[in-house]
């Protein structure tokens, strides 16, 4: 069979019509050094800062140091099978993590991969871990309270939705417990919680996840876990991954609480990476941009304007101090970035005052505006009363001849300290806190012995739940104190029955 020349030419024309002249150009570098979670690569001349890079073995890295002859890369995940001479290519993207409702109730690593053994996370939404914080005009003032359920915080250092409140203290002073209790209290408050664990022991994180599950808090919580055995880059990116997951909900108009436990370990991981990348060390061997490390993270916490949906992201960063030294480099940095701090003191903790919140050193710079009017009224003088009690207490040790007024102040102070104590994982609803503090400030506890204050508190809640639920409901719905005559009458009835049963 002979093929005609015109048929050949028409076939060639057809082929040429459908020919797609597309070239895939990849910029590829060669690994010249690898170790301790970092790599150096030669040949990536056009790579951008913070660009995501991919190694031959499928592992990813982030370009950190752009130098004249090579690029310093931090490796995300295992680096055992990356060798000198391996290829590394540009992706043209920046690091992103999966986000959305599918992550709620799950435990993930900083890359958003599940580590809880409950199967893959089905979501097609992602967000970059680094994003610009909302500007001044995209925000509004903090105006809604975030109830922690911890009496000492809600009364003395109130937190608002969209605020950044630092939790600071030595090791073993109850910082993590305080954060977990705050998450537990968000049940039924329509707040999504994200707990970012940085460098915490895996057994500790497991125990916390079990606590959250047992008390029904995993229904609205995501846990991001970077254990101490993970390479330093994972600890470094963990907070950014956590806040990116939170931003997805914030920009959807929801309220989010993100706990970073703790940022001291992230700073140490960043110091390690910076020294390995041969960046010049500064104070305490931290690099010069360690302030920016935390400021660019915490500035992403905001209460968005109504035009953007009015969502909020509240940040609770945790910082560990050494021997109560809050004037060290990282603590002072984070104190200056945040809107207040809750200082936990080891002396108070070991003497049995738990939560061990030092009312004198703790402050909330914006939360007062978000406090409900009823709480503002009953807790108004509490801080000054506590401060004067501490002062009087130190003077009272030197002499026993105290006048009546001073003795009354000391007695009220002892009861105040006792009222602010709280057992672990037992958050108190704000309306009950208001009633309790009203009873304290109006003298209904003056006749109760200090040892009986805890029992007085529990029986007061039981009595109000049974006989005065309307008063509690009114405080909850309006945020204001109910008719004071009714409230005083109810408290008088209870106080008289309590004291008579004690005689």
From Swiss-Prot:
UniProt site (Required for activity): 362
Subcellular location: Cell membrane
Enzyme class: translocase
Keywords: ATP synthesis, ATP-binding, Cell membrane, CF(1), Hydrogen ion transport, Ion transport, Membrane, Nucleotide-binding, Translocase, Transport
Similarity annotation: Belongs to the ATPase alpha/beta chains family.
Residues annotated as binding ATP: 169-176
Gene transcribed to yield this protein: atpA
PROSITE patterns hit by this protein: ATPASE_ALPHA_BETA
Physiological role: Produces ATP from ADP in the presence of a proton gradient across the membrane. The alpha chain is a regulatory subunit.
Keyword Acetylation tagged: no
EC number: 7.1.2.2
Entry protein name: ATP synthase subunit alpha
Major subcellular site: membrane
Source organism: Lactobacillus delbrueckii subsp. bulgaricus (strain ATCC BAA-365 / Lb-18)
Lineage: Bacteria, Bacillati, Bacillota, Bacilli, Lactobacillales
Gene Ontology cellular-component annotations: plasma membrane; proton-transporting ATP synthase complex
Gene Ontology MF terms: ADP binding; ATP binding; proton-transporting ATP synthase activity, rotational mechanism
Quaternary structure (record): F-type ATPases have 2 components, CF(1) - the catalytic core - and CF(0) - the membrane proton channel. CF(1) has five subunits: alpha(3), beta(3), gamma(1), delta(1), epsilon(1). CF(0) has three main subunits: a(1), b(2) and c(9-12). The alpha and beta chains form an alternating ring which encloses part of the gamma chain. CF(1) is attached to CF(0) by a central stalk formed by the gamma and epsilon chains, while a peripheral stalk is formed by the delta and b chains.
Reaction(s) catalysed (UniProt annotation): ATP + H2O + 4 H(+)(in) = ADP + phosphate + 5 H(+)(out)
Recorded topology in the membrane: Peripheral membrane protein
InterPro entries referenced in this protein's UniProt entry, alphabetically: ATP_synth_asu-like_sf, ATP_synth_asu_C, ATP_synth_asu_C_sf, ATP_synth_F1_a_nt-bd_dom, ATP_synth_F1_asu, ATPase_a/bsu_AS, ATPase_F1/V1/A1_a/bsu_N, ATPase_F1/V1/A1_a/bsu_N_sf
Pfam families cross-referenced by the UniProt entry: ATP-synt_ab, ATP-synt_ab_C, ATP-synt_ab_N
